[in-house]
């Protein structure tokens, strides 16, 4: 609460605190370890995907092979492993589809989100490495570089002018008075 009186502005605050107990009290390290290691929810409970939803998503062996290659995993898998991966990827795609379909605020369709979610090999190509000479040249050019986007102007800051004795360090003093 803020009050204005003859002595000026008075500010007073009140503190509100509420406590409630959730679950049993954890007394030992073993109790804490067990509580942290036990799952409290799963995607299967949140979204029950039926066979109709799973069949609406088409995942081929070619897609699984491509995902494995992009992930740098071994592509030599058994038919059982492939079936398991197809099932897992289908469930994930049904989950993502569920998120988009139930988003009432968004009028966009799933295909319009390609700008946000993309996997292009060129995104992961590193640039050319710098040589020592190039790095030293960049360091030498640094004092002359001015970035107007940061509000810098040419000659706006010079460390040598801050110290009247022109020593290679700066001394900052507060204003007297």
From Swiss-Prot:
Residues 1-16 form a transit peptide. GO terms for molecular function: ATP binding; glutaminyl-tRNA synthase (glutamine-hydrolyzing) activity. Residues 148-177 are annotated as: Disordered. It catalyses: L-glutamyl-tRNA(Gln) + L-glutamine + ATP + H2O = L-glutaminyl-tRNA(Gln) + L-glutamate + ADP + phosphate + H(+). One of its GO terms (biological process) is glutaminyl-tRNAGln biosynthesis via transamidation. Allows the formation of correctly charged Gln-tRNA(Gln) through the transamidation of misacylated Glu-tRNA(Gln) in the mitochondria. The reaction takes place in the presence of glutamine and ATP through an activated gamma-phospho-Glu-tRNA(Gln). Required for proper protein synthesis within the mitochondrion. This is Glutamyl-tRNA(Gln) amidotransferase subunit F, mitochondrial. It comes from Scheffersomyces stipitis (strain ATCC 58785 / CBS 6054 / NBRC 10063 / NRRL Y-11545).
